[in-house]
């Protein structure tokens, strides 16, 4: 397969390395911040992989959709406009797969957290919170992965109704609020943890990324899956769609 990469930052470079090391795929083009994105730049590619920033993603999306090439998006920070993006994808008859984190390990972790949140739901003595750590260059917080985890916890545990991203000096956390804490430190690739606490014990479920290679490899695998699916079932997909089919 031939891939066009949009974004030449740390993740874009890691994706290019994974493709080069595969022995069976190739990078058709790498488009960076200085490239004027037009639909013709994607012709001859089987899939687009986008790792940019929110503003660049929105600016480039019309051209990517018009190209008709399946799009895998790892750019985060636009969850508030997801409904709008889904409509654009549908109207264009395009295929787009979005994930805040393409790591297989992270996605196994998220499913474990969701199951733990479900299991403790009937037992009021257990409380749950979530925390994430990333390098100081990461622009958005909480991370997209943390927000995804929060959605999964809320859907699995009816005792938690809303997410609190930052605590204030004059307000206590309500029992039905889920705290999602963020820490920016050094060059941390990414660490996510769910904390479950009672008077008797504490359960901690964590995932720590050792490098960006897992994220990049997952993005490439998702792009291969999306390219195959695009011919018969275009649409808006998530990593869950890919994994549900893979794990079945």
Curated annotation (Swiss-Prot):
Keywords per UniProt: Amino-acid biosynthesis, Cytoplasm, Diaminopimelate biosynthesis, Lysine biosynthesis, NAD, NADP, Oxidoreductase
Annotated catalytic residues: 134 (proton donor/acceptor), 138 (proton donor)
Domain of life of the source: Bacteria
Subcellular location: Cytoplasm
Binding sites annotated in the UniProt record for (S)-2,3,4,5-tetrahydrodipicolinate: 135, 144-145
InterPro entries per record: DapB_C, DapB_N, DHDPR_bac, NAD(P)-bd_dom_sf
Catalytic activity: (S)-2,3,4,5-tetrahydrodipicolinate + NAD(+) + H2O = (2S,4S)-4-hydroxy-2,3,4,5-tetrahydrodipicolinate + NADH + H(+); (S)-2,3,4,5-tetrahydrodipicolinate + NADP(+) + H2O = (2S,4S)-4-hydroxy-2,3,4,5-tetrahydrodipicolinate + NADPH + H(+)
GO cellular component entries: cytosol
Positions with a binding annotation for NAD(+): 32, 74-76, 99-102
Pathways involved: Amino-acid biosynthesis; L-lysine biosynthesis via DAP pathway; (S)-tetrahydrodipicolinate from L-aspartate: step 4/4
NCBIfam families reported for this sequence: dapB
Family: Belongs to the DapB family.
The protein's role, per its UniProt record: Catalyzes the conversion of 4-hydroxy-tetrahydrodipicolinate (HTPA) to tetrahydrodipicolinate.
UniProt name for this protein: 4-hydroxy-tetrahydrodipicolinate reductase
């Amino acid at each position: 397969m031939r891939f066009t990469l949009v974004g030449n930052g740390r993740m874009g470079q890691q994706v290019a390395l994974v493709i080069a090391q595969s022995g069976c795929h190739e990078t058709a083009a790498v488009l960076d911040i200085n490239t004027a994105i037009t639909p013709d730049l994607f012709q001859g590619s089987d899939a687009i992989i986008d790792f940019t920033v929110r503003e660049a993603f929105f600016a480039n999306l019309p051209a990517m959709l018009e190209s008709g090439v399946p799009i895998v998006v790892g750019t985060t920070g636009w969850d508030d406009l997801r409904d709008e993006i889904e409509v654009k994808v549908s109207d264009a008859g395009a295929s787009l797969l979005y994930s805040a984190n393409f790591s297989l390990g992270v996605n196994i972790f998220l499913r474990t957290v969701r199951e733990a949140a479900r299991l403790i739901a009937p037992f009021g003595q257990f409380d749950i919170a979530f925390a994430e750590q990333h390098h100081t260059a990461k622009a958005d917080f909480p991370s997209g992965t943390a927000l995804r985890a929060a959605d999964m916890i809320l859907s699995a545990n009816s005792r938690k109704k809303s997410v609190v991203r930052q605590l204030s000096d004059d307000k206590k956390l309500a029992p039905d609020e889920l705290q999602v804490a963020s820490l920016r430190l050094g060059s941390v690739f990414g660490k996510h943890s769910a904390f479950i606490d009672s008077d008797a014990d504490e359960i901690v479920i964590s995932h720590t990324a050792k490098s960006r290679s897992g994220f990049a490899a997952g993005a490439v695998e998702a792009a291969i899956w999306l390219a195959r699916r695009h011919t018969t079932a275009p649409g808006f997909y998530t990593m869950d769609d890919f994994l549900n089919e893979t794990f079945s």
